[in-house]
Amino acid sequence: MFKKNINIKIKTKILNLRKKIEMWNNNYYVKNLSLVSDEKYDSTLFELNELEKKYSMFLNTSYSNKIVAKNICNKFKKIKHLSNMLSLESIFNYKNLLNFHEKVKKNLFYNEKRYYCCELKIDGLAINLIYKNGILDSASTRGDGLQGEDVTKNALEIKSIPHILKKNNLSFPKKIEIRGEVFIKLSTFNKINKMLKSKRKKLFSNARNMASGSLRQINPKITKNRSLSFYGYGIGYVNEKKYYYDQHDALKLINSWGIPIEKNTELCKSLNEVKNFYEKSIKIRDYLDFNIDGIVVKVNSMKLQKKLGCSSKYPRWAIAYKFSSEEKCTKILGVNFNVGRTGVITPVAKLKPVYFMGTIIKYSSLHNKDIIDKLGIMINDTVCLKKSGDVIPKISRVIFEKRKNVKEIIFPKTCIFCKSKIEFCLRKKNLYCTGGFLCYAQRKQLLNHFVSREALNIKGMGNKIISQLIEKKIIKYPSDIFKLNTDKIIFLKGMGLKSSENLIKEIIKSKTTELYRVIYGIGIPNVGIYTSMNLANYYKNISNFINTSYEDLRSIKGIGSFTSNCIKKFLKDKRNISIISDLLNVNLKIK
Ligand SMILES: [Zn+2]
């Protein structure tokens, strides 16, 4: 019974994953829309593959073809591939690579060399070119692996695809499939997007979408204007055995016929060399004029490739080893300074918008001066964004080789919001505005903090209400809240008679409160809820607290020198004392 339930669960899971992939594929291939980030897509597909491998009884064999069949758009004629054109299975770590290697090893012929042909995995779209006696006969997309869309007219507009192969000392085969990747150079991508922008047309979110949209065009003239590029990566079907070459030699062969190939390709003689190639690829990707999202590892021996064969979905002799912690590069256009509740000033880099992990990133926090110095960031620098956990990507490094016309990041001397003095906190390595409630940037957040659940706990007084009250200059300091009446709040957006009355009731209720709530609510830097309780417990009433000394504070268990300094400094400021006495003047009853 138990087992049966689990089976149903797994089956549902597999079906749901398939549905998701199908929906994404359909949007991606037919409408050129990426609904999810590449990483999300890859990891979902990986999860599905793993489940299907483990629970093969649920694997409906007609399925894999069925889902991709929908990926063919009706606007193109279909062309049948001479040999299947499967996509590659993706892996993400060295352990997966070892597994792949073990499987290959099991199938080794006696004294067969374990070489791998390693190539950069260009992020474009696959194309199948059929040459008959050296003349381009047809070009098609991958489609469902069995047949693709006829894009011959468009392929003829791609300069790097030869219409006629170059003669060498080997005669041309009667029929050969040459496979490769069509992509768009990043420099071209930027140029075209700039042009589209000037015409107020919709921009492409990434180079691959642009390449795909440009190749799969009814109008070949558009393909021509987009100046697509092409690299060959292998041979599919060929009618004569004498053209059966090992992968690395096959690349040399097609290159001698005038097919451009990517020049970083390496023949790796050990797994260690594959690993080195992978690491090298991560380093060079920033300098390439095209996007790569990993490397392709192919068993070099043709004989062994044939022996390994294919599963229902993937060839067993090749694998796509993807970059796991994806990096994206962009430029720092400037730096803004945000002021937080406690006055901390956070430098935020304004970035040249970049599509990353499924969203467009425009800003990235630089945290503090220390981090800026450590990374050596300057305005106009080209920087790399790196995925950090599941949250917002962070700037991980500067590409110093690309440094040009840089400017130093200069921190303001006075607060840009309230002109108060800016001080440096040595321990936290950050700058903060000393304005407190006087600072417009801090006021809203301080007041929100003051009414929050653990502080004065005024129910119904949310951010929206506070923002309006501040904008209308009805409140400025905490004590102003207790001077509110229904007449002053009934006109606010989202308020009615009933809700106004309720809010006033809540405000009145909160006037009888506890000491720790007030200490916490006035927002002393570095004083959280537990420290506030600790202090309230010790001082018993507000005037004892106001008149305390540093030594007295230090004598309290759990309060260190840093916190003591923060409190003492806060209490030294007359403005803060008047905020507290104003609260007492509006009859705040502190228990
Ligand atoms: Zn300020």
From Swiss-Prot:
Broadest EC class assigned to this enzyme: ligase
Binding-site residues, Zn(2+): 415, 418, 433, 439
Cofactor(s) required for function per UniProt: Mg(2+); Mn(2+)
Keyword Secreted: no
Gene Ontology BP terms: DNA repair; DNA replication
UniProt keyword terms in alphabetical order: DNA damage, DNA repair, DNA replication, Ligase, Magnesium, Manganese, Metal-binding, NAD, Zinc
EC number: 6.5.1.2
SMART domains: LIGANc (SM00532)
InterPro entries attached to this UniProt entry: DisA/LigA_HHH (IPR041663), DNA_ligase (IPR001679), DNA_ligase_AS (IPR018239), DNA_ligase_CS (IPR033136), DNAligase_adenylation (IPR013839), DNAligase_N (IPR013840), NA-bd_OB-fold (IPR012340), NAD_DNA_ligase_OB (IPR004150)
Active-site positions on this chain: 121 (n6-amp-lysine intermediate)
Keyword DNA damage applies: yes
Residue positions binding NAD(+): 38-42, 87-88, 119, 142, 181, 298, 322
GO molecular function terms noted in the UniProt entry: DNA ligase (NAD+) activity; metal ion binding
Pfam families membership: DNA_ligase_aden (PF01653), DNA_ligase_OB (PF03120), HHH_2 (PF12826), HHH_5 (PF14520)
Recorded catalytic activity of this chain's protein: NAD(+) + (deoxyribonucleotide)n-3'-hydroxyl + 5'-phospho-(deoxyribonucleotide)m = (deoxyribonucleotide)n+m + AMP + beta-nicotinamide D-nucleotide
Similarity annotation: Belongs to the NAD-dependent DNA ligase family. LigA subfamily.
HAMAP family: DNA_ligase_A
Function: DNA ligase that catalyzes the formation of phosphodiester linkages between 5'-phosphoryl and 3'-hydroxyl groups in double-stranded DNA using NAD as a coenzyme and as the energy source for the reaction. It is essential for DNA replication and repair of damaged DNA.
Protein known as: DNA ligase
